[in-house]
Amino acid sequence: GLGDVYKRQEEFRAGTLDEVPVWMNKNGRIMLVKYMAVRDRNGQYIGTLELVQDMEFAREYFERKHD
């Protein structure tokens, strides 16, 4: 939830966390959302990058592998 977002940003700012992966099901598809701290050359936190990847290919691969 929103509390998790604020906690993650505080940890990014403090330098205690650099990346958070979040797996979710979106409209029946497996998605991986990665939140990554963006830092300047001095290591100062300047923002968060959100990367969303459709991981459905992985489910399809493993389902075929077990046939």
Residue ranges and their predicted role:
Residues 33-39:
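A short, hydrophobic, proline-anchored segment that marks a local hinge/packing element in signaling
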Residues 16, 21-31, 46:
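Per-ARNT-Sim (PAS) sensory domains and their PAS-associated C-terminal
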Residues 41-67:
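Sensory coupling linkers of modular signal transduction proteins
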Residues 8-12:
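Conserved mixed alpha/beta catalytic, RNA-binding, or beta-rich assembly cores of soluble enzyme
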Residues 13-16, 66:
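Generic secondary-structure transition motif, activating predominantly at the C-termini of alpha-helices
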Residues 2-6:
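Short, small-residue-biased leader/transition segments that mark boundaries at the very start
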